[in-house]
C-alpha cells in the first residue's frame, strides 16, 4: 500500500519540489548537485572581490523530528487532498511505540514526530516538508545568493543534506539562522551548528577573522565532505582530495 502511495506522489513531486533538490526525485541524481557545488566554488575562486561563504548544514535527526501536524498542513497546502490525504492521516494518526527492556515490553507511548523508518513514503514526505524552508530561503531578499550570469544560486539539497551559497556572510548569517529557527519551531527541524562546515572566501585575513567571530559554524580550510565526495576549497584539489585517496585505499586493500 505505501509503495503504491509513494509511486502516486512521485508522479507529481516535480510540481511541488524545486529543481535545487535531487534526492528521491524521478530523473534527478546526486551528482547533479555535486557538479553544481563544484561550479559555484570554481566561480567564487575566479572573482576579484571575494565576500562569500558556502555552508554544508548538518540537520539533527531531521527525519525523526518532523512534526506530524505540520506535515499534514503542508500536504494540504500543496493540494494533496481526498482519499490520498486521508490514508496518510490514518498512517500518522496517534502512532505509538514500545521499548523492550530485558525482554519485557514496556507501556506504549505516543509518537508525535518522525517519518516512519523504512517506509517508501518517508523521504517524499520529508522532501515536501523541507521545501517550505528551501522556498523561504530562496524568496528571502535579505539572503543574497551567488550571482552566476542571470541566475542567483542559493541552495543544493539531497534529502536533509543541504548546502547554502551566500554573499556578504557577515550580514546574512543572522538572517539564515533566524529563518531556520522559525521553521524549526513549527516543523521540528534543527541544525547542529558544530557539525556544520563552512568555506569562507574573502580578500584578506582581517575580513575573514571578523566574519569567523560571528559564525556558529566550523570553518573548513581544505575540504567539506558532501554526499560521500570531498569538495575542496579550491577546485584544483579535486583530484588529490578524491581520486588519490581512493586509489591508495584500493592499492592497500589489494596488497593485503
Question: Model-predicted segments: where are they?
Answer:
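Nucleotidyl polymerases of mobile genetic elements and RNA viruses
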Residues: 1-256
